[in-house]
């Protein structure tokens, strides 16, 4: 069975944490296809700061050394806000016989009940939750705990060989980097070079982004 991983985010900007997390995931799971999915206008997050075109360009630059990582722009190509359930339905229509795995952070899992038609997500894809030990101190909503009790399975072969319906928690390493923090540091003219791929850093400086 062909296995597909989908890593969604605003990538505003894409940073070394995104890349290192993805490399760790692939080293452990080895999905046949791995897509970075830039969101257009997330329904439960503020609007992005860079344009869609700029965010895609930064992704292209960041992924140049990693030809196995692809970019999927279907959310940007839609005229409607980014609802993950619609995106996964689109993937499922295109890849009817593949396993689909959506990669989310542990915070994303806790906020899952806020997602539009969130109950349908597990029927469309598996969930690979990037967990970190410090997050386990946060209270888990009852609806999410019920979901974990029913669908959690940390056997990686399940994700690779089942169309949907499993939740796997995986520690991909701790990287104290966030796009929000990088934007704030750039606005304060602080050095962020070590947190960004070189080509992305050069692009941000050239475009004078996040000033």
Curated annotation (Swiss-Prot):
**Coiled coil segments of this chain:** none
Gene3D superfamilies per the UniProt record, alphabetical: HUPs
Instruction: Identify the pathway.
Output: Cofactor biosynthesis; NAD(+) biosynthesis; deamido-NAD(+) from nicotinate D-ribonucleotide: step 1/1
Q: Which SUPFAM superfamilies match?
A: Nucleotidylyl transferase
Q: Please state what the protein is called.
A: Probable nicotinate-nucleotide adenylyltransferase
| Purpose of the protein | Catalyzes the reversible adenylation of nicotinate mononucleotide (NaMN) to nicotinic acid adenine dinucleotide (NaAD).
| Source organism of the structure | Legionella pneumophila (strain Lens)
Similarity comment text for this entry: Belongs to the NadD family.
Catalytic activities:
nicotinate beta-D-ribonucleotide + ATP + H(+) = deamido-NAD(+) + diphosphate
Query: What keyword terms does UniProt attach to this protein?
Result: ATP-binding, NAD, Nucleotide-binding, Nucleotidyltransferase, Pyridine nucleotide biosynthesis, Transferase
**What Pfam families has UniProt attached to this entry?**
CTP_transf_like
EC nos: 2.7.7.18
Entry-linked InterPro entries? Cyt_trans-like, NadD/NMNAT, Rossmann-like_a/b/a_fold
């Amino acid at each position: 069975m062909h296995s597909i991983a989908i890593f969604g985010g605003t990538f505003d900007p894409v940073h070394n944490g995104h890349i290192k997390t993805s490399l760790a995931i692939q080293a452990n799971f080895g999905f046949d296809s791995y897509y970075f999915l830039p969101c257009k206008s997330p329904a439960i997050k503020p609007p992005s700061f860079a344009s869609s075109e700029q965010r895609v360009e930064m992704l292209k630059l960041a992924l140049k050394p990693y030809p196995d990582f692809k970019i999927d722009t279907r959310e940007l190509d839609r005229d409607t806000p980014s609802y993950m359930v619609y995106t996964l339905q689109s993937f499922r229509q295109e890849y009817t016989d593949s396993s689909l795995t959506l990669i989310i952070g542990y915070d994303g899992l806790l906020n899952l009940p806020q997602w539009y038609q969130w109950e349908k997500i597990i029927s469309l894809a598996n969930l690979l939750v990037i967990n970190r030990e410090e997050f386990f101190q946060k209270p888990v909503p009852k609806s999410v705990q019920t979901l974990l009790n029913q669908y959690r399975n940390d056997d990686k072969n399940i994700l690779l060989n089942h169309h949907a319906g499993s939740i796997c928690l995986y520690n991909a390493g701790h990287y104290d980097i966030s796009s929000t923090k990088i934007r704030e540091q750039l606005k304060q003219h602080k050095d962020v070079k070590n947190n960004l791929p070189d080509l992305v850093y050069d692009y941000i400086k050239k475009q004078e982004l996040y000033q």
